């Protein structure tokens, strides 16, 4: 089994990067036959800007550019996709959001039938989300941030494409908590990555066929 671990943080010495490494270690420890790839979006200088060229891809007027096609191929090779990211303003960083905007394109991640019904094309994909935040859990619950992130990311992005979000973790108090606690959690997630993925029932919830990109 193969995991693609996508990390979005500019500092290679960050806790976010360390957690990604621990997830990878857990994947290897679970079964020597498992494999993983860490996609460091900052190190590879992925351009997150959604340009006119990307809009042409969305309209099916042009094929995906080389950098987008390469990321799609990475995901196609994976049995599980793991996103590891710091939480900026109660959501994912622009680098990761732009990666999703460009890579999860019309025709590859989703499509529309002749009668404008949504066709979810990533039903085979199992997704694990690991957000790293500085605030405590009470803050996320009291203000509704945790639910808002699930609505936007778990449901709004991945369910729209048919992908099953198997686990969605918030590792909080990142600047106060003993890093070992979060590292142990990340390693355990890696160990169980493919076990829990098998339990995913991907019926999804309904979206209508409305285009998720505004053309105005």
Which residues does each PLM region occupy?
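Conserved anion/nucleotide-ligand pocket segment
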Residues: 162-166
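N-terminal beta1-alpha1-beta2 submodule of the flavodoxin-like/Rossmannoid cofactor-binding fold
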Residues: 1-108, 167, 173-176, 180-216
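Short, glycine-/small-residue-rich phosphate/pyrophosphate-handling segment
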Residues: 111-161
